[in-house]
From Swiss-Prot:
Domain Radical SAM core as annotated: residue spans: 143-377
Gene, per the UniProt record: miaB
Record CDD domains: Radical_SAM (cd01335)
Phylogenetic classification of the source organism: Bacteria, Pseudomonadati, Pseudomonadota, Betaproteobacteria, Burkholderiales
Catalysed conversion reaction: N(6)-dimethylallyladenosine(37) in tRNA + (sulfur carrier)-SH + AH2 + 2 S-adenosyl-L-methionine = 2-methylsulfanyl-N(6)-dimethylallyladenosine(37) in tRNA + (sulfur carrier)-H + 5'-deoxyadenosine + L-methionine + A + S-adenosyl-L-homocysteine + 2 H(+)
Self-association and partners: Monomer.
Source organism superkingdom: Bacteria
Protein name, UniProt field: tRNA-2-methylthio-N(6)-dimethylallyladenosine synthase
Length: 457
């Protein structure tokens, strides 16, 4: 009987990428296949996030729920990976003794060996070391699932923002060799991938030798240009970037590389210089706005998303008003916004915080409502326009429809004969937007690129 692995992912797209790699590693070494049901699994893995306290506690809550599965099946392997694992280490086993494996983001490639040692010794295995970029040398070829794919180009972060635990859980910035990244993407393109998202905690800090042993360094802008030259790749996205390292060379890339989408996720975190300084972000609001102005001079239709932290220690009403002024000026398409959550071991955790939680919650609700209004306004403005999308899959709610994403990352559902689905998935098509919903769009198929004009009957 085929053995199965269940992976639950918390947090960012880096974790989503790592979860896919866990499945790939165990599939290649152990023959495991992915399941969406923990009750059917022989291996259960939690890929964790420690950016916010709520996500961290959710992990232990979920561990408690699978404990009875372990009691019913002592051969079941339960593992905890990701940033909580890096932060807590063996303390996870002390708190939940039924956990068999604890591994960090840099050691997921060692999962098969850790499982073997657990079975041989009967003892929990903990490996949260930082072997830099070693894991990429031990990962099997990626298994393609659709025309879009994530590709990790670097690991770690060296910015040490005062509130952030990532440098302590993922280590310092280390870039993958240029050849490795391009080889992986070329392999994905050969398997039908048309769109890649380049991943890193701070992708625009990417620096790598042009070739093995080369003293000539390729930066992130140059990497994008190389990726654009790979046959079959039609769209390039990336996340996450840092305003401090948004160079003029990277800005110029938006003029030189049409395949680079007109959508940017650029976390600002706050709209007050005083708070940004306390956060140790390394830029001012004016410097952030200058980057956006330069980009929109090249791409007037550039859509912008961001991250915002409300209620950072010392935040006044004036500080929050400055944040809202920035939101109105930048016209953000989306914002991942949260109330500040102090993380143990970070400098900000020692700052005095005298703002009542109800005030923070009210500010967050105001921010999110304003962003939602802007999202709807942008969606409404797209009605009647022709948008080029990459068809990714059948629509989730209606099997007679297909779904894809616009350049500004909106999901578009459109009707198409079922007989045409296999042909259209993976194609770039033009759709006319006919209706805007809060979090998606509805369209009508107009044209299939590199193909005959589409028909809907």
């Amino acid at each position: 009987m085929t053995k199965k692995v269940y992976v639950k992912t918390f947090g960012c797209q880096m974790n989503e990428y790592d979860s896919d790699k866990m499945v790939d590693v165990l599939g290649a070494a152990e023959g495991l296949v992915k399941t969406d049901t923990p009750e059917d699994a022989d291996v259960i893995l939690f890929n964790t996030c420690s950016v916010r306290e709520k996500a961290q506690e959710k992990v232990f809550s979920d561990l408690g729920r699978v404990r009875e599965l372990k009691e019913a099946n002592p051969n079941l392997i339960i593992g905890v990976g990701g940033c909580v694992a890096s932060q807590e280490g063996a303390a996870i086993v002390s708190r939940a003794p039924y956990v068999d494996l604890v591994f960090g983001p840099q050691t997921l490639h060692r999962l098969p060996q850790m499982i073997d040692k657990r079975r041989e010794s009967g003892r929990a295995q903990v490996d949260i070391s930082f072997p830099e970029i070693e894991k990429f040398d031990h990962l099997p070829p990626a298994r393609v699932d659709g025309p879009s794919a994530f590709v990790s180009i670097m690991e770690g972060c060296s910015k040490y923002c005062s509130y952030c635990v990532v440098p302590y859980t993922r280590g310092e910035e280390v870039s993958r060799p240029l050849d490795d990244v391009l080889t992986e993407i070329a392999g994905l393109a050969d398997q039908g991938v048309r769109e890649v998202t380049l991943l890193g905690q701070n992708v625009n800090a990417y620096r790598a030798g042009l070739t093995l042993g080369s003293t000539e360094i390729a930066d992130f802008a140059q990497l994008i240009e190389y990726v654009a030259d790979i046959p079959g790749i039609e769209r390039i996205r990336y996340t996450t970037s840092h305003p401090k390292e948004f160079t003029q060379r990277l800005i110029d890339t938006y003029a030189k590389v049409p395949k680079l989408v007109s959508h940017l996720h650029l976390p600002v975190q706050h709209g007050s210089d005083r708070i940004l300084m306390a956060m140790k972000r390394g830029y001012t609001v004016l410097e952030y706005k200058s980057v956006i102005r330069k980009l929109r001079a090249i791409r007037p239709d550039l859509s912008l998303s961001t991250d915002m932290i409300v209620g950072f220690p010392g935040e006044t009403e004036e500080d929050f008003d400055k944040m809202m002024a920035l939101v109105h000026e930048m016209k953000y398409d989306t914002s991942f916004s949260f109330i500040y959550s102090p993380r143990p071991g970070t400098p900000a955790a020692n700052l005095h915080d005298d703002t009542p939680r109800e005030v923070k919650l009210k500010r967050l609700q105001h921010l999110q409502a304003t962003i939602e209004e802007n999202v709807q306004r942008i969606s409404d403005s797209m009605v009647g326009k022709i948008e080029r999308i990459l068809v990714e899959r059948p629509a989730r709610k209606d099997p007679n429809e297909l779904a894809g994403r616009t350049e500004n990352n909106r999901v578009v559902n459109f009707p198409a004969p079922i007989a045409s689905h296999a042909r259209l998935i993976g194609q770039m098509v033009d759709v006319k937007i006919v209706k805007a919903y809060p979090h998606s769009l509805r369209g009508e198929l107009v044209l299939v690129h590199d193909d005959a004009p589409a028909t809907t009957h």
